[in-house]
């Protein structure tokens, strides 16, 4: 466990890995420790799991995974972006063999899919299935980009397989198209054979309507 093991990075390095796939790294300090620990080992490839959340407030779509001007909005995204930049710098300066994979909103077995409210509250699906009216925040133009967990795994596998082309690069792991909250909601009404009943509320009123501060 990375949080419980003070020497987590050192213990990984002691295994003399050829490839490290780092899925549980959420802080720049942990990235720095891992790079330092793996220096001088037989490592041939380090794959870092970032997130499209590192993009933050996008100015254009589709976003460029290799952008150096991302504007993350919270600590999670900020730390992912800082780790991306750190790994890119280590690759350029020292040849550290890093690749960055940026998954979207992951779905599939073991995952509760992100819903048209942008959270994991299944209540919205129940409302839609009953043909009830739902409300979306603002104008429902916020964007989600889903991906199946299996496809995320394939991105890591393909990056390992095509190592030379992947080194020093960032890649999105997302579906072919993104969805607005509004478009997603309409698709769900159609899936349940119900007439779309979609309204809109400003952010504060929508938060009251949704009712769970932790999810908003």
What does each model-identified segment do?
Residues 1-19:
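N-terminal Rossmann/SDR dinucleotide-binding element
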Residues 85-115:
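Conserved beta-loop-beta element that borders a ligand/cofactor-binding pocket
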Residues 155-215:
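Mid/C-terminal beta-alpha module of Rossmann-like enzyme folds, strongest
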Residues 13-62, 67, 78-90:
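NAD(P)-cofactor binding segment of oxidoreductase domains
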Residues 61-85, 105, 114-122, 145-146, ...:
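Short-chain dehydrogenase/reductase
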Residues 46-48, 99-105, 145, 172:
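Structural signature of the Rossmann-like NAD(P)-dependent dehydrogenase/reductase core
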Residues 100, 140, 145-153, 170, ...:
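Conserved loop-to-helix N-cap of the C-terminal "lid" that shapes the substrate pocket in Rossmann-like
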Residues 124-147:
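A conserved pocket-lining segment of Rossmann-fold NAD(P)-dependent short-chain dehydrogenase/reductase
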């Amino acid at each position: 466990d990375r949080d419980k093991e003070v020497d987590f990075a050192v213990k990984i390095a002691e295994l003399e890995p050829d490839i490290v796939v780092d899925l549980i790294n959420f802080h720049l300090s942990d990235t720095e420790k891992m790079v330092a620990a793996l220096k001088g080992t037989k490592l041939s490839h380090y794959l870092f799991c970032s997130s499209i959340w590192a993009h933050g407030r996008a100015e254009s779509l589709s976003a460029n995974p290799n952008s150096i001007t991302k504007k993350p909005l919270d600590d999670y995204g900020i730390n992912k972006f800082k780790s991306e930049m750190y790994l890119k710098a280590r690759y350029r300066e020292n040849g550290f063999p890093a690749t960055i994979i940026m998954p979207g909103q992951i779905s599939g077995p073991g995952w509760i899919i992100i819903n048209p409210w942008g959270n994991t509250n299944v209540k919205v699906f129940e409302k839609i299935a009953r043909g009830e009216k739902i409300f979306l925040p603002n104008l429902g133009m916020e964007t989600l980009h889903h991906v199946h967990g299996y496809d995320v795994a394939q991105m890591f596998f393909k990056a390992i397989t095509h190592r030379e082309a992947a080194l020093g690069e960032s890649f999105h792991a997302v579906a072919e198209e993104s969805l607005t909250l509004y478009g997603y909601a309409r698709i769900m009404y159609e899936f349940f054979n119900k007439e779309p009943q979609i309204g809109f509320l400003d952010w504060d009123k929508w938060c009251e309507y949704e009712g769970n501060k932790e999810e908003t």
